[in-house]
Amino acid sequence: MIKAVPKQGELNTIGLHSDLEALKSVLSYPHMLLILCAVGIWGANFVIMKNSVDVLPPLMITAMRFLFTLVPAVFFVPKPKVRWTNLLGYGLSIGVVQFGCLYIAVDGLITPGLASLVVQMQVLFTIAMSIYLNSERITAYQLSALILAALGLLIIGLHTDNQTSLMGVALTLVAALGWASGNMFSKRATGVNMLSYVVWSTLFSVPPLVCLSLYFEGLQTIAEHLSTLNWQTFIGILWQAWGSTIFCYGIWGWLLARYSAASVAPFALLIPVFGMGASAFLLGESLPLWKVGAAMLVIAAMLLNTFGARFRSALRNRGARLRELKDAN
């Protein structure tokens, strides 16, 4: 049986479908800059969080953060066209679970730098949830990137000190699980304005946080701290509400609605790099060689995850052109 020989130029279409599928997982350059800006703010925010819990109770700060996220923005942005149950799930996952646990953890149970590291387990949790719930596929280069990043995180994790407790690590892991769960809810909220989505979801964050603060921290303690609240702490809370929450989570959810979770979530692995850099610059934290080495591994992982599809596609196209030239000769 004689097989048809492809015409010259047809080989360019071989594997084109798979290449296009791979490129769907690659962020455009403007979107890359947006998400880098978001993770940079998140990283530096760990320093602000630590400064805040040194002045106010952690659950009280969390409630105030999301209260100022909700008000006054909720009066100016329309409700997103998404089910109330989706907003409920996102609001509880991000507001209560992630940040409720995270603020408690950085209040003397774990250092800000290590917290910025451990919470990145949300990347693995997000990808695992995507595989199970959405049947998303992970490419070989994405898996390799995760392994590199895990090595970098392991190096940092092996250099803990007496300022970190198992309870702090456990609470931060629960926070990471809350973040990953929030990623799943925002992933399902396709075609909505993510700014309004983030704002309206805090309707379900504030009430439980206020109740938890009243129960665990007490009305008298809350009243005493509010009476002595200074303008620096107040501005810090506003920044966490408007900059870190509305701006950054709006970007994060907006990109998750357009790209696979396996492409967006690994960018959060840069948060410890920004967090440690901000801590070194603002708090005088030292940066020994092991921290620099770990940061390099994380950056290498991000480069592989970001440019892996482009590199593979370029290699395939080059191989196809070489075969065409060989057949032509």
How should these model regions be labeled?
Residues 48-51, 55, 68-83, 150-164, ...:
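Membrane-interface helix-cap regions at the ends of transmembrane helices
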Residues 52, 61, 105, 132-134, ...:
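Hydrophobic/aromatic residues within transmembrane alpha-helices
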Residues 2-7, 11-15, 41, 51-97, ...:
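Transmembrane alpha-helices of multi-pass small-molecule transport proteins
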Residues 47, 70-73, 126-127, 132, ...:
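Transmembrane alpha-helical segments that form core, pore/gating elements
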Residues 60-70, 103-146, 175, 261-280:
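Specific alpha-helical transmembrane segments that line the substrate/conduction pathway
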Residues 36-44, 48, 88-109, 128-129, ...:
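Hydrophobic alpha-helical transmembrane segments of multi-pass membrane transport proteins
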Residues 67, 73, 128-129, 138-158, ...:
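Hydrophobic transmembrane alpha-helices of multi-pass small-molecule transport proteins
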Residues 2-24, 28, 33, 62-66, ...:
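C-terminal-most transmembrane helix of multi-pass membrane proteins
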